[in-house]
């Protein structure tokens, strides 16, 4: 299985997505540091939200085969700048989370990740297990 690093803002669903991918119970816990278990690298949202720790994400991304930009389907904004994906020297995919939420805007999330340069976009719901198998198949 390919190693993947998940990047996104706090509360975007990175940790919950990893729990769903592993088949674990969904239990909220705040990620405080870069957590590498199995083939999944979980990152604190604060690393992506601020300027100070972005370099750490870049360094850790070299340990992964794939970079996953995680964007919540209910977000009113996107922390990733347009055309940021080509900076990585590995595939960058977009992962839209919380697609089961009533106020989810899948088209807007897809457009934002396409503007980032993501070559493939997955739509997921960790609660409903939507898109989990598709993402696992991609990573296999």
Go through each PLM region and give its residues.
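Inter-motif core of Ras-like GTPase G domains
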Residues: 51-75, 82-93
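Short gly/ser/thr-rich secondary-structure transition/capping motifs
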Residues: 23-27, 48-52, 75
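Conserved nucleotide-binding/hydrolysis micro-motifs of P-loop NTPases
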Residues: 45-47, 74-76, 99-102, 127-130
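Conserved beta-strand/loop subsegment of P-loop NTPase cores
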Residues: 65-71, 88-100, 115-125
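Switch II (G3) loop of P-loop NTPases
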Residues: 36-54, 72
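Conserved G1/Walker A P-loop phosphate-binding module
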Residues: 1-43
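Canonical P-loop GTPase G-domain recognition
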Residues: 102-140
């Amino acid at each position: 299985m390919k190693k993947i690093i998940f990047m996104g803002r706090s509360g975007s669903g990175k940790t919950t997505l990893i729990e769903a991918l592993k088949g674990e119970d969904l239990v909220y816990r705040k990620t405080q540091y870069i957590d590498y278990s199995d083939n999944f690298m979980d990152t604190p949202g604060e690393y992506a939200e601020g300027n100070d720790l972005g370099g750490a994400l870049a360094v850790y991304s070299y340990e992964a085969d794939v970079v996953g930009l995680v964007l919540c389907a209910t977000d009113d904004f996107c922390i990733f700048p347009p055309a940021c994906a080509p900076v990585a020297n590995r595939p960058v995919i977009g992962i839209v989370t919380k697609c089961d939420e009533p106020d989810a805007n899948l088209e807007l999330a897809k457009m934002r990740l396409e503007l980032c340069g993501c070559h493939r976009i997955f739509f997921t719901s960790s609660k409903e297990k939507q898109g989990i198998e598709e993402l696992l198949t991609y990573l296999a």
